[in-house]
Amino acid sequence: MPKGMCLKSDGFASNIYDPASDFTLHHFCAEKGIEYSDAGLPVRLDTFSAYGLAFKERKVPELEDKMVTCLERLPNGFRLGLDSGESFTARRVVLAVGITHFEHVPADLATLPPEFLTHSFRHHDLEPFRGRNVVVIGGGSSATDLAGLLHEVGADVQLISRRTALKFHGKPEVGKTRSLWQRIWRPQTGIGPGWRLRFCADAPMLFHHLPENLRLEAVRRILGPSGGWFAKDKVIGKVPLLLGCTVQRAEVENGRVRLHLRGLDGSTHDVRTEHVIAATGYKVDLNRLKFLSSEIRSQLKIVNGAPVLSSGFESSMPGLYFAGITAANSFGPVMRFAFGAGFAARTITRVVAKSVAKKSGSSSEPVRHELHEVKVPEPRQKAGAASGS
């Protein structure tokens, strides 16, 4: 993700979960002398990344940093293969693979060669785009953040979105006491204000018991594309916007990309650029997890690309659990955020501990565990695509 980017979540909602809650982002920033506020001060990506590494060293120093290349089913569990050639077995596996594998690029753009098209996730250093003409496609936080940062490094950037207007979060009112009526009417949560978000943030288990069609529709509609409040001033009035347009076709002509666009009124026109960045979000599709054996992928019960999960985050394959964005269809949009990790961790730990105790015949027997960082190979990409060259 781009250097200089900020998290959309507030400081109080950007903690990594641990039962004691004694090493929050606030604690980390205080130790390092980094400015912090529960709300109203954006959390920089580099600050959050440093916090994550410090959390690992302090809380789980025994975590193994290994690349998992295959996961196969066995009669009594699973076999995991590592890129080092090592392998080991486990009765239970929890997959929390994040968003890396689920980059979504619209079909009308996907035909472009990788030297002309990249996904926003692939970019960290934007300096290679200084002085170049770039088009960013999208209307959410990735698109607005990226467009603003590209403008700051000196790129000639334009933002194109099918939406007729960009949405931005409102800036939190820091230091101002909210009235009782305001707190009742629009309660604050770790993923935004309002009763719908309060339900999603505080009651993921109740969300899980909703009918499937309601859950899927809620995940699709709630928390739609919107930029962080801090990105608005970096984009509006500074980055040229082309709104209400969709890409009908994309092709390369004379070393530049030609985008064929259609407006809501049916009008058509073309835009030419050196490079296109698709800030078009992520779409869960377990078939993209190539380290999963074909047997596992074919036997998992899947709806809309995501695993169907029990109330304990267990998939239809006993012993295989999913957390993070892959659990959103089952437990709601809060699973996309660090704020939802606490619920997932507590639930999975309780279910696994109960299962182990049941098999051992004693609820008092301690649970033995091994920690392995679930690192999996990223989708292959041709050289030069990440740098935009």
Language-model segments: residues:
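Flavin (FAD/FMN) cofactor-binding and adjacent substrate-gating region
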Residues: 2-34, 188-208
